[in-house]
């Protein structure tokens, strides 16, 4: 016996077949259809035989394209007039038209080629594009191929337009340079004027400062002179008062002899009072 394989447990949900939503009769869609006469078990359609009983699959829109954009894109990719794109039954219609016009064999051959191409492209999915179509020979305005003569004319016109653009660019560059030179001249002139103004202002300030200094010196000298004059006057007044006092003291005094004796006695008394030893001797006070 060999080894047992790895056990994998498969879990089933509550609704593995996803039929709970279709069997739920309380939903809005179910009730809305029943109002229009639909009953459970019936299909969708006007005739009961051809009605659809399968669930409708909704394709998820994962782009920003509008309605009909894919059909228009497929129409633009047509190879020839017999390319039917995604329209079913068009090949049969083309065969009928071929029979009526007497071109049944040609139409059948073209349709067989398309059928084989679809089979091959379905297997390998390769689409070959001719090298001529890669060139810019398609005119979107007229929706036709451009001839080489027209391409040469267009190229010459493009060259002329390039030359005109170069000339315009040069002219613009020259204008810009002229504007820059004018701006520089204006700036230089304005700078020179501003410098002159600054110099004149400095000169005026210096002159004012010199004048102020002179005025200050003159005021100080005047103040000094006034103060000196006042001092001289005061000294003269003092000298005059001193002279008058000296003259008054120099007058001869006729002091009487009695006053002179009294003054001497007073002086002696004061000297004795001021001297402590003399007082002790007078009052007979000993040091013991």
From Swiss-Prot:
Major subcellular site: nucleus
Ranges of Low complexity composition bias in the record: 238-256
Localisation: Nucleus, Nucleolus
Pfam family, one: G-patch
Described function: Involved in rRNA-processing at A0, A1 and A2 sites and negatively regulates telomerase.
Similarity-based family: Belongs to the PINX1 family.
Protein name from the UniProt record: Protein PXR1
Organism annotation: Candida glabrata (strain ATCC 2001 / BCRC 20586 / JCM 3761 / NBRC 0622 / NRRL Y-65 / CBS 138)
Gene of this entry: PXR1
């Amino acid at each position: 016996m060999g080894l047992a394989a790895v056990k994998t447990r498969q879990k089933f949900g509550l609704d593995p077949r996803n039929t709970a939503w279709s069997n739920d009769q309380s939903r809005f869609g179910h009730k809305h259809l029943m109002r229009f006469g639909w009953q459970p078990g019936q299909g969708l359609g006007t005739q009961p035989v051809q009605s659809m009983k399968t669930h409708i699959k909704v394709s998820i829109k994962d782009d920003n394209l509008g309605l009909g954009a894919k059909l228009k894109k497929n129409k633009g990719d047509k190879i020839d007039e017999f390319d039917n794109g995604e329209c079913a039954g068009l090949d049969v219609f083309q065969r009928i038209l071929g029979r009526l016009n007497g071109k049944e064999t040609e139409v059948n051959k073209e349709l067989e080629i398309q059928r084989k191409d679809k089979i091959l492209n379905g297997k390998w999915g390769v689409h070959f594009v001719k090298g001529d179509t890669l060139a810019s020979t398609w005119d979107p305005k007229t929706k036709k191929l451009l001839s080489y003569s027209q391409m040469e004319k267009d190229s010459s016109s493009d060259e002329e337009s390039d030359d005109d653009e170069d000339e315009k660019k040069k002219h613009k560059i020259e204008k810009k340079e002229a504007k820059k030179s004018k701006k520089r001249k204006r700036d230089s002139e304005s700078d020179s004027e501003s410098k002159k103004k600054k110099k004149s202002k400095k000169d005026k300030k210096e002159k004012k400062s010199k004048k102020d200094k002179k005025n200050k010196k003159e005021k100080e000298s005047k103040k000094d002179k006034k103060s000196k004059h006042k001092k001289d006057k005061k000294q003269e007044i003092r000298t005059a008062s001193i002279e008058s006092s000296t003259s008054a003291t120099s007058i001869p005094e006729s002091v009487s002899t009695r006053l002179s004796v009294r003054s001497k006695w007073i002086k002696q008394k004061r000297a004795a009072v001021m001297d402590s030893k003399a007082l002790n001797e007078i009052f007979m006070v000993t040091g013991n």
